[in-house]
Amino acid sequence: MARNATNKLLHKAKKSKSDEFYTQYCDIENELQYYREHFSDKVVYCNCDDPRVSNFFKYFAVNFDNLGLKKLIASCYVENKEGFSSSEAAKNGFYYEYHKENGKKLVFDDISVSSFCGDGDFRSSESIDLLKKSDIVVTNPPFSLFREYLDQLIKYDKKFLIIANVNSITYKEVFNLIKENKIWLGVHLGRGVSGFIVPEHYELYGTEARIDSNGNRIISPNNCLWLTNLDVFIRHKDLPLTRKYFGNESSYPKYDNYDAINVNKTKDIPLDYNGVMGVPITFLHKFNPEQFELIKFRKGVDEKDLSINGKCPYFRILIKNKRLQK
């Protein structure tokens, strides 16, 4: 299956520090259209991006005036550009700052980058200095370093919009941030992130892997999402509920180790149930904090995985409906 095959590629990426997955311009454009109001007079930092090839940098440079940006910064870990840049491999990481002085427009083929003293890792003191000067971080960080990456954004109290694997929301620290309403899912998830450009040395697995008209090698894992702390109107829309619990109790079995019912699909959440419900993790894509309360993740009262007749469904989030209907 295509999903299984491309997941192998994502697993392969976790073994690489550089995680060479480049985001397509169309996916960036599709997501960023919902956040335009946040960028006026802001400094945007893409801290995992070679400015000469990054579509994140390109998007913000092209839309610099439309968004009303103050400054755009991109920085790159030295290995990120291997296989993507036509120039000689740099000895150090590098960065580029763009603020459109004197009305000059950026020529992408003529970007003169500045070198770091070190490798340009996002955790380096040089990269952190740029982070401190920025307002909003937007990028596709290395999957293998996701926890450290998110921790850093939280530590420095930065606004952000980043790409992550769907399974990242099962991390305890990530779920807690979502539960505390400090971060949330963006607009697009799964097939809403259409694919990633990969270098020549990556094998193209699965029926959804392809080479586009520009010769880019693209894989489509269909299991990625956007995480952010930029508010967007869509997350405040109520999830329409059409199913009922009463009269259909057999469709909603109770857990062995928690006083809650199991709901296999988000669309099957009953509108008339007053108690706690266990729902799939992808529910968070539809989560409206005014409509639902997040109770707990995955575990029962015995701190073991939630189970039904001794069998454990895939990770569940325990929730409660704040707007009960009859």
Swiss-Prot record:
Could you cite one Gene Ontology molecular function of this protein? site-specific DNA-methyltransferase (adenine-specific) activity
Q: Which UniProt keywords apply?
A: DNA-binding, Methyltransferase, Plasmid, Restriction system, S-adenosyl-L-methionine, Transferase
- Superkingdom of origin organism: Bacteria
Which Enzyme Commission number(s) are on file for it? 2.1.1.72
Q: What are the disulphide bonds in this sequence? A: none
Q: Name one GO biological process term.
A: methylation
Reactions that this protein is recorded to catalyse = a 2'-deoxyadenosine in DNA + S-adenosyl-L-methionine = an N(6)-methyl-2'-deoxyadenosine in DNA + S-adenosyl-L-homocysteine + H(+)
InterPro entries found in the cross-reference section: DNA_methylase_N6_adenine_CS, EcoRI-like_methylase
As for family, the record states: Belongs to the N(4)/N(6)-methyltransferase family.
Task: Describe the protein's quaternary organization and the partners it interacts with.
Answer: Monomer.
The protein here is known as Type II methyltransferase M.EcoRI
Task: Record the organism.
Answer: Escherichia coli
List the lineage, top down. Bacteria, Pseudomonadati, Pseudomonadota, Gammaproteobacteria, Enterobacterales
Which gene holds the coding sequence for this protein? Answer: ecoRIM
